[in-house]
Amino acid sequence: MISVDTYLQEVLAIAHPLAPLDMPLLDAHNATLSSDVYAGDRLVLRAGRRIRSTHIGLAASIGLDHLPTRPHPRVVVISAGEDLTEPGHTIDERHSYEANSWLLTTAVREAEAIGYRVHTIPDTTEELKDLIEDQLVRADLVVISSGPRSVAMMRESLSALGEMYEREVAMEPSGHHSYGLIGPDRTPVITLPSDSRGAYIAFELFVRPMIRQMLGRKSLTHRTLSATLVGEISGSKEVRSFHEAIISHENEVLRAQPVLANERGEANGLVVIDEQHSALSSGSEVSVILFDRQSE
C-alpha cells in the first residue's frame, strides 16, 4: 500500500507539459503562457500564468499579436460496464445509471481541459481494447472509470495496449487505482474507482494536478487550509480519509461542515483525516482542501 502523496508523484511523472505554440491574442485568452514575455529588457508577463483579459491588453499595447501558450489538454473520459445504463432509460435492479463519465467529463472541463465523453458496453476484452485504441488519436490523457463488473476486462484491455501499474492507495474512499502509458505515442492513462464519490475525489486529488501540469501551471493542487470542524466524522487509521464538506467563513473563522450524500453538490472542499486518527469531533481543528476554482 502506498500513500496518497506517493501516488500523486507517480501519476505526475507521466503527465508532461504539452508542447507550446503561438496563438493569436483572442485565441490565447484563458490558455497558459508557456514562456516569459519581454518588452525590450523588461519582463511584462511571466510564464505559467493563465492568460486573462488584462494580459491580452498588455500584450497588444506592446505590439504583440500572438502569445506563446500551452494548449488545453484533450482528455478522453471512458466509462465501460454492462451494468451501467445511460440516463433517460428505464433500469431494473441489476443496473444503475451511468453517472461517472458525465461527472468526470465536466470536471475535466472545469480544470480547463477539453473533455470528450465515451460510454460503452463491450462484449469482449478485444472490443474494449479496440475502442480505447481508437480514442488515442484525440487524447493527450485518458481517464477511465468502469462498472464494478468490468474492472477485470478494463485491466486486460489496458495491459494489451501498454505498460500499466496497479496501486493500492492508502485512502478512503478508495477502489481500483492504476495508471500507465498506452498506444504508439505512449499516451498517459489513469483509472478511477467505480464508485462516483471515490471517482470524483480521486479526480480532484490526482487527475486535476495531471491536467494542470500538462497546462504548464505552477500550482498543481488545491489549497490546503486549517478550519474548525462542525459535526463529527470518522475514518480508518493508517489511511487518509476524505469527506466532502461546505467550507465557509463565519465570524472570521473558517468552518468545515461535512455534507450528507444528497448534499454533495453543495460541497466546495474536503475535510482530511490523517493516517494517525480514526475520528474527529466537532470543534476540532482540521485540514481542509478548498475547491477555490475562481481564484486559480
State each model region's role.
Residues I2-D5, L21, L25-L26, S157-E296:
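Flexible glycine/proline-rich
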Residues T6, E10-A13, L43-R46, L58-S61, ...:
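Alpha-helical scaffold segments in soluble metabolic enzymes
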Residues M1-D5, T69-L192, S196-A202:
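Helix-rich terminal scaffold detector
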Residues I2-P17, N30-P122, R255-P258, L270, ...:
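Short, glycine/charged-enriched hinge/interface segments at domain edges or termini
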Residues L43-L45, I51, V142, L280, ...:
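Generic structural signal for buried aliphatic residues
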Residues A28, T32-L45, I78, V143-A152, ...:
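Structured N-terminal alpha/beta-domain signature
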